[in-house]
Amino acid sequence: MIYMASGTHYESWSALPLFDRVASPDHAKDFVPDLNDYESPTFEVDLLSENYDYDNFLTYSLPTVDPTKTLLHEEPLCFEGDFTNPAIDHYITTSSGLLDAVPSQLIALPSFTQPSKCPFPNCKSTTIFESGRDFRRHYRQHFKRFFCRYPDCSQSTQDIMEVGTKGFATRKDRARHESKHKPTVRCPWHDQEGQQCLRVFSRVDNMRDHYRRIHKC
């Protein structure tokens, strides 16, 4: 409650609660990369530093929206054990004719009623999941539902029946894989004449290994 003086009396009002605000929509999930309009990122970190967290390194962003892509329906649609639902074509996201990803709404999830381990067959996780959100995030990673968006890659597909046999469990795994198609991490070594090494890598750790083996005396 806030009080403000006004002449000889006080006026009071209450601040509006913050928890009723609606979250902003996540437009990033509808983005598809334009691989013909790519610019290498500018690095402001020491890629050779021992403390650099290169496991979380991403080599490019996905800035281009595909206006023809079908948006997801708000009501969840689940499968009964496999990806054979006839309505799936309406929900699939695509990139240049390739299957981009199968939405998480299409993965049938066991009901979460109490803290428990993952029930997926042969799951190696020993975590006791305390919330349904953490459980669902883990469970979906058992399904390879993200696919490479480079047409000639063995991890790309146009066939929905290949879901689960190729692809990646997370967007991060797919981004790490796709960086191999267009390496952007250049070796920072320069010779005495100022010429930079021409080797380019898709991963920071691979570049560091090259730098130590070839250039560091």
Curated annotation (Swiss-Prot):
The keyword Lipid metabolism does not apply. One of its GO terms (biological process) is regulation of DNA-templated transcription. GO terms for cellular component: nucleus. A zinc finger (C2H2-type) spans 185-215. The keyword Metal-binding applies. It is found in: Nucleus. GO terms for molecular function: nucleic acid binding; zinc ion binding. Keywords: Metal-binding, Nucleus, Zinc, Zinc-finger. Disruption phenotype: Reduces transcription of TRI4 and TRI5 and does not produce trichothecenes but accumulates low levels of the trichothecene precursor trichodiene. Transcriptional activator of part of the core trichothecene biosynthesis cluster. This is Trichothecene biosynthesis transcription regulator TRI6. It comes from Fusarium sporotrichioides. The lineage of its organism: Eukaryota, Fungi, Dikarya, Ascomycota, Pezizomycotina.
